[in-house]
Amino acid sequence: DFIPAEGRKPGGWNFEITSEEDLNARVIRSSSCTVSIPELDLEVNPGGNATGYVTNMEGLLNRFIKIVEMVMKDLDESEKENLKTLNHMLHRLQNAGLERDGLHVELLDPHGLSQILHPDAIDRDLTDEELARLPVGPDPAVFSK
């Protein structure tokens, strides 16, 4: 995981993808970070085996695309409404930065180790409500003598 030298407080980062250039924004996601795309009602929470990673917005969106495609493969023909919704999500994710409508990405990290490195990225404190509902990712290893 990525641990900065200075102490961090719980925080969130918001970023709107409005151009192709925005896809190059650097993303640092720690193992305790929840990533969401509110317009599409998509959210990835850290699990017990979560690891951190460094990528850019395009790489982050590609992770969501793979998940949506995987869910689509598991649907049968009787689930046409769900398939329509997933196709819409896929289209928005694949065309982020190319269309008029922006796409918001939000990082919520109770440990404060995640960041979006771009001049237009907005950092903020997490609300008490967010802190109460957010998972914190894997438990650190504890060693005894």
Residue ranges of predicted features:
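N-terminal cysteine/histidine-rich coordination modules
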Residues: 1-2
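Long C-terminal interaction/binding lobes of large macromolecular proteins
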Residues: 6-145
